[in-house]
Amino acid sequence: MLSLAENRKTIKGFSGGMMVHSGYQYGGDNPFNLNISSPTFGIGGCAKIHLTDHFRTGMEGFFSTAPIRKGVQSGSYNKLFWTGIPCDWFWQKGKVAPYIGATLGGGMETAFYLFEGDKHDWEPEVKALLRKQPFLAFDPYVGIEYAVGKALRLTLRADWLLAFHKEGLNMPTGPRVYLGFIFAH
């Protein structure tokens, strides 16, 4: 049984760690009618404080890079970086803790299109384009954590980043699956 002082704690615990992810981006948001359809890979992390026995919030940040091969030269890519404040609800059942939540924040899409040339030389490329587009990020996610020990958890998470800019929904978009480790107290 928890003592009255422990029950009144504002912060019930904290957790944080790193995750790698893989997914798929599709769609096009460019004047060249390039339909981006590519696997994407990345890394990121989170740090959260547990405010109740079932609710936690904090900060997180990730980046994800998708190589583009259709309609452009090798070396072209679409990169997403986003950071924000995650809020999720979790339910601890023995060693397993499923969770559901969303992150609200912002980010930047960087698109690099190489139309002619070679990425392996040191020559200036005349037909290349680099564009950066800031966006508002809303990232719903679901996941599950498994306690390996007292302080170490493995996490598996899936999300679908929705990035909005002044014209509406930013494309490309798509799902991602994360695998990582979380240290918790």
Please tell me what each predicted stretch does.
Residues L2-L51, F55-T57, A184-H185:
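Short glycine/proline- and aromatic-enriched beta-strand/turn motifs that initiate or cap beta-hairpins
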Residues S15-G23, E60-F62, G101-G107, R157-D159:
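Transmembrane beta-strands of outer-membrane beta-barrel proteins
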Residues Y26-N30, R69, W122-A128, L162-A163:
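Extracytoplasmic loops and strand-loop junctions of Gram-negative outer membrane beta-barrel proteins
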Residues G42-G44, T83-P86, D139-Y141, R176-Y178:
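Membrane-embedded beta-strand positions in outer-membrane beta-barrel channels/transporters
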Residues I49-W122, F138, Y146-L152, I182-H185:
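Gram-negative (and chloroplast) outer-membrane scaffold detector with strong preference
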Residues V126-V142, Y146:
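Acidic, glycine-rich flexible loop segments
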Residues P172-H185:
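Outer-membrane beta-barrel "beta-signal"
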